[in-house]
A protein has these predicted regions:
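Short beta->alpha junction loops/turns
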Residues: 33, 63, 83-84
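Generic structural motif recognizing short loop/turn segments at the entrances and edges of beta-strands
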Residues: 22-25, 51-57, 97-100
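A short acidic/basic microdomain associated with nuclease active sites
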Residues: 45-64, 69
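Catalytic cores of nucleic-acid endonucleases
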Residues: 39-46, 52, 75-113
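Solvent-exposed, charged interface segments at domain starts and junctions
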Residues: 1-6, 54, 72-74
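Interdomain/boundary linker segments immediately adjacent to catalytic/signaling cores
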Residues: 1-46
Length: 113
């Protein structure tokens, strides 16, 4: 992907998000998240930064109000960290998001390539 196409992709992803949630390349978390959940989000963001990708955390989609753990704006992928959610809940969540979703278990090693 050339530089222009990459920027268009990033802009398209940003347009899906509420204006107040367009803080790129910033790790955000809530006090309700476990340490394992926060650490996994950090590992994902760290790898995305190494790759030179733009990302958003805790971003809210404008149309649905859904909140994503981490969005890779370069690849249009949502990373959702889970600990106790059941498979049916994860599948419903994946069907609701406007982008591809990859579920990552908290407490495990992040090994995307």
């Amino acid at each position: 992907m050339n530089k222009r196409d990459k920027q268009l992709q990033r802009n398209n992803i940003a347009q899906l998000l509420r204006i107040s949630n367009r803080n790129r390349n910033v790790l955000k978390w809530s006090p309700n998240e476990t340490i394992a959940h926060i650490n996994m989000k950090f590992e994902i963001c760290k790898q995305l930064k190494i790759w030179g990708h733009e990302f958003y955390t805790e971003a809210i989609f404008a149309d649905s109000g859904l909140r994503a753990d981490v969005i890779d704006a370069d690849e249009a992928i949502i990373y959702e960290v889970y600990q106790t959610e059941g498979e049916d809940s994860l599948m419903r969540k994946a069907a609701s998001y406007p982008l591809e979703v990859r579920f990552i278990a908290a407490g495990q090693r992040f090994e995307e390539k």
